[in-house]
A protein has these predicted regions:
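Short, small/polar-rich loop/turn modules that mediate ligand/substrate recognition or access, typified
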Residues: 72-76, 81, 137-139
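Alpha-helical segment proximal to the catalytic Tyr-Lys
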Residues: 27, 69-73, 135
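Active-site helix of classical SDR
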Residues: 22, 56, 64
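Residue(s) in the substrate-gating loop at a strand-loop-helix junction
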Residues: 40
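Short C-terminal tail/terminal secondary-structure segment
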Residues: 45, 138-159
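Substrate-binding pocket helix/loop in short-chain dehydrogenase/reductase
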Residues: 1-8, 107
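C-terminal helical subdomain
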Residues: 79, 101-133, 137, 144-146
């Protein structure tokens, strides 16, 4: 049930927006620097029912690698791939569930660290990627998800 308008909105923001930003940045980064894109665990592993979002974030990951290869050694380019980060947007995803409490409990159980992420978890990764300590890192996707993608999504109650 995806429309062309849905495609334009999602790919416009997540793909075209990142592409245009990088295209604008590269000429002024001749002396070097670090580009940090916002990917998603949904670009690494497809989430059901989110084909466009998954594809748009996979594009960001591919573009990140291409920029790293084409514009090194002076420009580094990496992406952060967040999992569940408790923001207003993430909270609204639970609000549409039949049982909001059960949905949160189920999602939380999939995080080996025992909590959802908070914005500072992502900010700390961005800080490291922006600084000189990460000077040997480029073309990588950094998953910041509390271990969400480390485990299989299989339901243990099936066994």
């Amino acid at each position: 049930d995806t429309t062309d308008d849905d495609w334009e909105v999602l790919m416009g923001a997540n793909a075209r927006g990142v592409f245009n930003t990088i295209r604008s940045l590269l000429p002024i980064m001749a002396m070097g620097g670090s580009i940090i894109n916002m990917g998603s665990v949904s670009g690494l592993n497809a989430d059901p029912g989110l084909a466009l979002y998954n594809a748009s974030k996979a594009f960001v990951h591919g573009l990140t690698r291409s920029v790293a290869v084409d514009h090194g050694p002076k420009v580094r380019c990496n992406a952060i791939c967040p999992g569940w980060i408790m923001t207003a947007m993430a909270g609204s995803a639970f609000a549409v569930a039949e049982d909001e409490t059960a949905a949160k409990k189920d999602a939380l159980a999939r995080h080996p660290v025992g909590r959802f992420g908070v914005p500072s978890d992502i900010a700390n990764m961005a800080l490291w990627l922006a600084c000189e300590e990460s000077r040997f890192v480029t073309g990588q996707m950094f998953t910041v998800d509390g271990g969400l993608t480390a485990a299989s999504p299989l339901n243990p109650s099936l066994f």
